[in-house]
Amino acid sequence: MVTQALLPSGLVASAVVAASSANLGPGFDSVGLALSLYDEIIVETTDSGLTVTVDGEGGDQVPLGPEHLVVRAVQHGLQAAGVSAAGLAVRCRNAIPHSRGLGSSAAAVVGGLAAVNGLVVQTDSSPSSDAELIQLASEFEGHPDNAAAAVLGGAVVSWTDHSGDRPNYSAVSLRLHPDIRLFTAIPEQRSSTAETRVLLPAQVSHDDARFNVSRAALLVVALTERPDLLMAATEDLLHQPQRAAAMTASAEYLRLLRRHNVAAALSGAGPSLIALSTDSELPTDAVEFGAAKGFAVTELTVGEAVRWSPTVRVPG
């Protein structure tokens, strides 16, 4: 039995982690894009017990005990580092909306794991690398698109290797074309990935698979070199049409944006939308339609890589 080193109490670390949009149309479970909405996580080792406080988004929806996703991620990271803590105090300051398809769960996991880096560097342990953070976080998520975007920032292409004893998750960064501007449309409606994933068929036709493969390949070119191809590159047949019935307002808004030649897609599993454009603003009537339907339409920028740091504890 391996004995884990016990971290001293009073260590404090913090992490700042971005929201993310997955899929971008055809890149199902593979393409991700970090967005400039950030959660902050502060973790302190204590003598015993567990306290969890959450300010901001999701504060009244998440558990405040060991089942909290950040706590689970911290414990997972501590175990991976070969250390443990007698007690923990965890504080979350959330700006990323929950259950909207903006990577809030991936941000919680990546933020918790990154905060562990800030703890262990104050001892003789080594922090996890970006590749290790992606692996650890994706083990929670089951797919690396949001997790990789949260770790690396910017746009990513990720993949899963199932040839070994357990899935191995990897990702590479893309240099987003500087002319591309990002807009999100966030509704009041909530949705969970688990609920909408069951709407997807177990098998798809060869024609639909071929269509999405071509569009996903084109998406990489459009994101990096040819933003004029974004409309074609964000087409999808494998998940958005199947999810439309569960989020009719989002599906209607998506159709309207695309009729206005805006390269829009469901953000992850929805119900939020992500729009990529080389114009400085969305068409006025499209914005007005979204507002009338309860969508908060906002321009964002590309999110940065997760940042973590050891923090000096301030008494009092």
Swiss-Prot record:
SUPFAM superfamilies: GHMP Kinase, C-terminal domain, Ribosomal protein S5 domain 2-like
Keyword Cytoplasm set for record: yes
Catalytic activity as recorded in UniProt: L-homoserine + ATP = O-phospho-L-homoserine + ADP + H(+)
UniProt-listed Enzyme Commission number(s): 2.7.1.39
Keywords: Amino-acid biosynthesis, ATP-binding, Cytoplasm, Kinase, Nucleotide-binding, Threonine biosynthesis, Transferase
Location(s), subcellular: Cytoplasm
Pathway: Amino-acid biosynthesis; L-threonine biosynthesis; L-threonine from L-aspartate: step 4/5
InterPro entries: GHMP_kinase_C_dom (IPR013750), GHMP_kinase_C_sf (IPR036554), GHMP_kinase_N_dom (IPR006204), GHMP_knse_ATP-bd_CS (IPR006203), Homoserine_kinase (IPR000870), Ribosomal_Su5_D2-typ_SF (IPR020568), Ribsml_uS5_D2-typ_fold_subgr (IPR014721)
Annotated positions binding ATP: 97-107
Enzyme class: transferase
One Gene Ontology molecular-function label: homoserine kinase activity
Name this protein carries in UniProt: Homoserine kinase
